[in-house]
Amino acid sequence: VTAASGNYNSTLTSEMGKSAAPTLFVVGNQAAVKTWDDYCIDLKDTDVYKELSTDAFNLKDENGKVASMGYCYESYGIIVNKKLLKKAGYEISDIKDFASLKSVAEDIHKRADKLGFDAFTSSGLDDASAWRFTGHLANMALFYEGRDDGWKEAPAEIKGTYLENFKNVWDLYINNSKYDKNTLATGGYDAEAEFKKGEAVFYQNGTWEYDKLKKSISDDDMQMIPIYCGVEGEEKAGLCSGTENCWAVNAKASKADQKATLEFMKWLVTSKEGTKVMAEQFGAIPYKKAADSGNVFLKNANDLLEAGNYNVDWAFNYTPNVDEWRASLVAAMNKYDAGGSWDDVKTAFVQGWATQYKAANK
């Protein structure tokens, strides 16, 4: 059964009430785990579970049962033009944490006129670009706080424990680019085009950019690295990877149907034909025998996970009234860029969350 866009939960509810209910279905977030937990078998001891290359994309219920397992994912981080980096006298291996990223970026910016390129692309805060920072960059502060505090659902309040780390990276972006930080609010910049033209070494974006960049920059000259922000132990960070594409198997189905479904899932992620289909349809899959999707950035994400680096989850999925929260954050960041106080950003981040949580949970 195929659900119309935005109607998956209602379609699933309807289908689960039928005599021939689906055996394989999607449980993509913690809210869905709460709703469908009774319908999910524990996948932990299944053969397909043993084929995972990481458990970073699995969802568990409050008792630790693996209710669903990720079958594909997307990632974002900092895309690096390795050719330009080398021209500036550096290698990727020189960047292992925020301190080294800062040192390299500031040196490139200092020599930008001589080199013919700068450190970072523009960080526009107009509607076309702001999500990269109010969503994806802000995620760094949300992820580490959520990791410390064990978030399983959206908290009513946040503390902003890692806001200084968010500031670290934002300052680095806006102070080491050829574009004046006072102009970022007005829009009109095209960071993707700047990167394609070789105007900057670093560009924060995701695996979805690969197809747009590959015609201008060769695979050998591109790599995605983690967003380092000055947190202890971050040299073992991976990319920011997430998904809402997670398989669950119906606990109310017959044992025979469950067995057939689990065998089919295993075939999809281990056989030559199955993994080829998965790579073509979904890109990166978190399984040991995954076929190469051809996307260099997805390979970078997988390599880091397989090396034992921790995944930086998409904690921004917890954001209450996401559009309103981000709009308030954009306004505060624009004020800060124009010489205002970081306290405004702190207020929008922390108090704004509490305000939007109340509004969303009346």
Question: Model segments located where?
Answer:
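Extracytoplasmic "Venus flytrap"/periplasmic binding protein-like
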Residues: V1-D55, K83-G89, K96, V201-F202
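Glycine-centered hinge/linker elements that transmit conformational signals in sensory
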Residues: A105-E106, W151-A185
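Extracytoplasmic/periplasmic solute-binding protein
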Residues: A67-Y71, Y76, K102-P155, A200
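A structural signal for short loop-to-beta-strand junctions that line the ligand-binding cleft
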Residues: S14-E15, P22-T23, K50-L85, G116-D118, ...
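Extracytoplasmic/periplasmic substrate-recognition and gating elements
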Residues: A88, K215-Q281
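Conserved C-terminal helix/tail region of periplasmic/extracytoplasmic solute-binding proteins
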Residues: K86, K110, E273, D292-S293, ...
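Hinge/lid segment of periplasmic solute-binding proteins
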Residues: G28-V80, R132, A138, Q223-I225
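Short, solvent-exposed loop/beta-turn-alpha elements that line the ligand-binding surface or hinge
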Residues: K44-D55, F120, G124-D127, A141-N168, ...
